[in-house]
Amino acid sequence: MKFSIIIPVYNAEKYIDKCLASILGQTFENFECIVIDDGSSDNSNIIINKYTVNDQRFKVIHQENMGVGAARNAGLDIAKGEYIIFIDADDYVTNDFLEKFALKICSTNADIVIYSLTELHTDSIRSIVFEANNTEEIKKNILASVWPSYSWNKCYRKYLFENIRFPVGEIFEDVLIIPEVCLNAGKIVCIADKTYYYNKQ
């Protein structure tokens, strides 16, 4: 089992080191991390290179600034893992992030795993836990917008993106395709453990 982690980066020098360090520290080591530098004009690339030079699992794509949708698509185009994970450059994960996915996938054979998260605000922290009894309940929650259509709080079997790509130049590009991706999935499960730190500061 191999994971492809896709991280779009645009002028994220304040955050990207912590993000990539959290990937480097994973207890489950069979992954590739594809970082897409979306035309950054700050020092993001210098920080990214620190990882790509020292660890072959980290790869970087440089492109002109085309937006997060195009950046995620560029990562999807070269991803070699069986499972796809999107992480935003200003977020980070726990060191057992991938290990929990691997265990859940092995025990359930799920096409999508939805994970719970911790929201980081300037003056507060909020826990968001996703739980459901079955796949149909999860799909209803996503299609009815009861649950958010984030791309980054899910692990996807790669085949779900064979014929689907993110729209380019659109705001809230996740909302435009993630419900369809989830609808096409066979089995969807949740992890109650909060393994993702979502920076809303």
Task: Annotate each PLM feature.
Residues 22, 37-46, 88:
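A conserved acidic beta->alpha catalytic loop
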Residues 84:
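Short aromatic/hydrophobic "clamp" motif used to bind/position activated sugar donors
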Residues 7, 30-39, 59-64, 89:
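Short beta-strand/loop segment that forms part of the nucleotide-sugar
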Residues 12-25:
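Short, well-formed alpha-helical segments that are part of the catalytic scaffolds
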